[in-house]
Structures are given as structure tokens and as C-alpha cells.
Design a protein with these regions (language model features):
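Long, well-ordered, tryptophan-enriched scaffold segments
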Residues: 173-318
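Glycine- and acidic
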Residues: 7-12, 31-39, 103-110, 243-247, ...
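Residue-level preference for the first positions of well-ordered beta-strands
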Residues: 136-138, 164-166, 270-272
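Hydrophobic or amphipathic alpha-helical targeting/insertion segments
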Residues: 158-160, 164-169, 175-177
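Cofactor-binding active-site loop characterized by glycine-rich and histidine/acidic residues
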Residues: 40-161, 315-317, 321-325
Length: 329
């Protein structure tokens, strides 16, 4: 399957039934490539299915994906025609380990540490709306980066603007506890179902026409629904900020993610999709010790042990060497 991916949108030619095989081939490619060059492995192995699902429901480069930090964008780079560049990953003159606009029209934002993807995505959203254009903007942020103050400032701003904007929370269980999955997923689907949305609107309009008591009944229904949701959906933190919350969803089940991402596209206003992933998935050493494979040098695939490589002088070495120089008087 991987040999069929050579340029953006080639993924749309892949049958849905073949996506699991494509995911497996991408993982194997990443393990083999990073074992030779070094790079960020655990985070990239964790978002293979998430990236495939996003690319499947979006139309790049017209639609925009903003990656927070950016070191988890390797699969994105593969899907946008840079597979052959991995042999020069993070080398001078080679492909960057992060999104770079100079590399591809599909790289929306030159990312860096951290918590800035929602703000950057919101900038694209505002530009789109002011220019009267029509494309999707998706910001992908991890639960660790979501602890940054800039992220919450941007969430608040997105809720205030009330414009269409999708935020994907890539939760690999580092900072945010799991929510009540079954009920939350059910209510998320129910809230965004077109039939339910239409029925809710019609019932509200009809009740408001009832003299004296109609409006009171509507207010009571809203308060009751809100109270029940507060009890069973921890995602109400985001709902209370003014964002529609969908999830959580298994970040390694592509069909479920595609369904939820398509639901997010139907939502009017900002929406946050909560995706649960596992760092290092598909490679046992990285899965058991994701911290050791966050940013790794070349390593032995069988054992996971890093290989000794010849290194150049450190900044400290260079600084020390200058202290021995005799300056002219």
C-alpha cells in the first residue's frame, strides 16, 4: 500500500479496507527509517491512525492541519509525498523533523514548542472568514501541550468567535484522565446527528409558542439536560467554555475516528475531538519506554538499544577551546 502514496491526496485512492495494512506499513517504515537516522519515534508511532483518519476526511492542501510542537508529523510527511526524504531526516540540507512551509504546501505552520497550535489555527480561521473562503482548519494538540496557558487563551478566543474550527486533542494519557467513554461517545453522536438537531430545534420553537408556560418549559429542559451532562461527561469543561466536545474515541480505530471527524465537520462553531492514543504503538521497546524513544539516536531494531555514533564537538567543548586562546594586546 505504501508504494501507492507519492503525493498529497493519494490516500483518497486507497480503499478503506486497506487502511489497516497501510498503517502497519507506515509503522514499519518509520521504525526502519528512524533506526538509521534517529528522530522522534514514540510520538509518531502513536498517531499513525489518527493522521490517516484526518487525511482521509480532509482535502489537503486546501484544508489546513496545524500540528502542535510538530515532532509527531512524520506520517503527515509520508502522506504528502516526502517518503523518499526520510533517508536525510534531520540532516544538514535534508528534511526537517518538524513541519516546514518551505518543504510542502501541506505544512501549514512552522511548529515549535509548544501550546501554540490552537492560536495558529485560529489565525487561519480568522483569515478564512475575513476573505470569505471555505476550507477546514484542524489544530492537533497533545494533552501535555494543552496544559500551556496559550492553549487555554486560544480556546477561550475560539469559543468567543463561534466560528467553524476543529481541535483534535491527542491524549496519550500523560496529563488528562480518561473520560466515561461509552456514554460520552453516545451523547456526542446524538448531539451532532442531523435528525436530532432538527428535532430539537422544532420542539424548542413549538414550545416557545405555548402562552406563559412554553418558555419556562424550554428553560427547564435546558437546565435538566445540562445537569445530567455535567454528571456524566468530564468533557463539560470544554462545553462550558463554549466548544462542542466529541469523544473520547480510540485513536487506533480509524473507522471510529473518521466517523467522529465527519461529525465534527457538521458542527457549527468550534469543536474539540478527544482522541486516545498510545505512544510507541507497534514497537514494543518504544511502547514500554516511550520516554527513551521520544527523541532517539540510531538504534538496533531487535533490541531497541541505541547505537554509538561519532559526535561532533558540543557547544561546551567549543566554548572551552576559546578560553585557551591568547587575545592580542
Amino acid at each position: 500500500m505504501l508504494e501507492k502514496i507519492n503525493k498529497p491526496n493519494d490516500i483518497h485512492k486507497i480503499a478503506l479496507a486497506d487502511f489497516p495494512q497501510l498503517a502497519d506499513e507506515i509503522r514499519q517504515f518509520l521504525i526502519e527509517s528512524v533506526s538509521q537516522t534517529g528522530g522522534h519515534l514514540a510520538s509518531n508511532l502513536g498517531v499513525v491512525e489518527l493522521t490517516l483518519a484526518l487525511h482521509n476526511v480532509l482535502d489537503l492542501p486546501q484544508d489546513k492541519i496545524v500540528w502542535d510542537v510538530g515532532h509527531q508529523a512524520y506520517t503527515h510527511k509520508i502522506l504528502t509525498g516526502r517518503k523518499e526524504e526520510f533517508k536525510n531526516l534531520r540532516k544538514e540540507g535534508g528534511m526537517s523533523g518538524f513541519p516546514k512551509r518551505c518543504e510542502s504546501d501541506c505544512d501549514t505552520f512552522d511548529a515549535g514548542h509548544s501550546s501554540n497550535s490552537i492560536s495558529a489555527g485560529l489565525g487561519y480561521v480568522r483569515a478564512r472568514d475575513l476573505l470569505g473562503q471555505n476550507y477546514r482548519v484542524v489544530s492537533v494538540i497533545g494533552d501535555g501541550a494543552l496544559t500551556g496557558g496559550m492553549a487555554y487563551e486560544a480556546l477561550n478566543n475560539a469559543a468567543e468567535l463561534k466560528t467553524n474550527f476543529i481541535i483534535v486533542l491527542n491524549d496519550n494519557n500523560m496529563s488528562i484522565s480518561k473520560n466515561v467513554g461509552g456514554m460520552s461517545s453516545y451523547l456526542s453522536a446524538l448531539r451532532t446527528a442531523e435528525a436530532y438537531t432538527g428535532m430539537k430545534l422544532n420542539v424548542t420553537k413549538t414550545l416557545k409558542k405555548v402562552p406563559k408556560v412554553g418558555t419556562a418549559v424550554v428553560d427547564t429542559m435546558r437546565r435538566t439536560k445540562s445537569s445530567i451532562k455535567q454528571l456524566i461527561i468530564p468533557g463539560m469543561l470544554f462545553e462550558n467554555m463554549g466548544l462542542t466536545y466529541l469523544g473520547p474515541v480510540d485513536g487506533h480505530n480509524m473507522r471510529q475516528m473518521m466517523k467522529l471527524f465527519n461529525e465534527a465537520k457538521r458542527v457549527e462553531g468550534p469543536v474539540i475531538v478527544h482522541v486516545l492514543t498510545h505512544k510507541g504503538r507497534g514497537y514494543e521497546p518504544a511502547s514500554l519506554h516511550p520516554d527513551q524513544f521520544h527523541g532517539t539516536g540510531p538504534f538496533d531494531i531487535k533490541t531497541g538499544r541505541q547505537l554509538s555514533v561519532k559526535k561532533g564537538p558540543t557547544y561546551t567543548d567549543v566554548s572551552v577551546s576559546y578560553t585557551h586562546l591568547t587575545l592580542p594586546t
